[in-house]
Amino acid sequence: MSNLVDFQIRALCRESGLVEPFLPEMINPASIDVTLGNKILSEGLICGPEALRTRWVEHDLADDEEYILTPGAFILAHTNEYVRVPVNLEANFQLKSSRGREGLDHLLAGYIDPGFHGQITLELTNVNQRHNLTLKPGMRIGQLRFGRLKEVPTRSYAKTGRYMNDKGAIPSKG
């Protein structure tokens, strides 16, 4: 597998909608920056027989609205960008180093299969012990790296994936 570089990512964004909306200034030497979307799912109170239905509380943020992530809190968020990974590529999401230095952590589900289309759900937590983090729709949250596969898989996520075409922050489907 070989990683794509700036001009290859730019060409795929323009020709096949690899990442939309596409802004050329988001291109890095071997990745493209993505921004935080406007839907956040936070943990609700879990007690009683309705616990499974009330686990998540949805927050639909306006573009200028902030979400305060308290120390130790866990949320599901999503990228503003819609990603279309061709079947001959794979992708990985990584948090921007600036976000990590602030105490934000993205948990381990950063792999994006060949053939996936949709917004990327992000599993975020504040690892600070004392300080809140402010999240805002549109802020640069991470970057996507793309790798070219040596062969095209016999199965595509487009046919087998349970999170295909998702939009917004999506909890586990099992």
Residue ranges and their predicted role:
Residues 1-174:
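DUTPase catalytic domain/fold
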